[in-house]
């Protein structure tokens, strides 16, 4: 996102730490009803020009109309075969009633799923999930942020991605980055990509 400023994606793609390389990246595309991340186009082109599998995410504002937020994402992001599914990032209520927040999320999810013909991934923290989303949107893949846990995030639902660290360092990016892992093998990873 704009927080990482200039990223050298070719260097990132060749980075290896303890025999672990960067296989995928989620890039912030949009926020709310009208904001596009100022570095999205540059990052999207840069990352897609490497062997890194790319996904785009929308930072969801719980008090704003879900369809308007979906339109913002759709007009900004062109997904192609081999990309990760679109992501809705929900982290705060911003004073919204949880029921209204879930209705707005549902609007975004349905509109984006209809447009891209793939189920979006829901990104949230373990605490937010347990408090407001547990039992809802069960048919959608979950990407959960729960930092510095030993083996896995502490949630009862199955998860697809786990953001386990928000203070990572990667050559090619001057600012701290979030580290994520995929729950599955290479075949399972390939199966979730846009076809």
Model-derived features: where do they sit?
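Functionally critical loop-and-helix segments that line ligand-binding/catalytic clefts
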Residues: 1-5, 9-10, 137-195
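Substrate-binding cleft of extracellular glycoside hydrolase catalytic domains
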Residues: 1-118
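Generic hydrophobic segment detector
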Residues: 15, 40-47, 114-122, 171-195
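Flexible, glycine-rich phosphate/dinucleotide-binding loops
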Residues: 34, 63, 129, 151, ...
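Short secondary-structure transition/capping segments
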Residues: 69-79, 99-111, 130-138, 162-178
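Catalytic domains of cell-wall/extracellular-matrix polysaccharide-remodeling enzymes
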Residues: 84-158
């Amino acid at each position: 996102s704009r927080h990482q400023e200039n990223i050298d994606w070719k260097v990132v793609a060749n980075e290896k730490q303890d025999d672990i390389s960067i296989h995928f990246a989620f890039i912030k595309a949009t926020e709310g009803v009208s904001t596009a991340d100022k570095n999205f186009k540059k990052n999207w082109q840069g990352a897609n020009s490497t062997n890194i599998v790319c996904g785009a995410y929308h930072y969801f504002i719980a008090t704003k109309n879900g369809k308007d937020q979906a339109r913002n994402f759709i007009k900004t992001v062109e997904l192609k075969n081999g990309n990760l599914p679109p992501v809705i990032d929900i982290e705060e209520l911003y004073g919204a009633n949880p029921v209204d927040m879930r209705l707005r999320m549902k609007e975004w999810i349905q509109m984006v799923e209809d447009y891209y013909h793939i189920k979006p991934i829901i990104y949230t923290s373990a605490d937010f999930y347990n408090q407001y989303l547990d039992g809802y949107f069960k048919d959608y893949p979950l990407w959960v942020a729960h930092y510095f846990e030993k083996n896995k995030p502490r949630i009862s639902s199955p998860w697809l991605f786990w953001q386990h660290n928000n203070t990572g360092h990667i050559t090619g990016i001057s600012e701290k980055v979030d580290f994520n892992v995929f729950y599955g093998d290479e075949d399972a990873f390939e199966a979730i990509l846009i076809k």
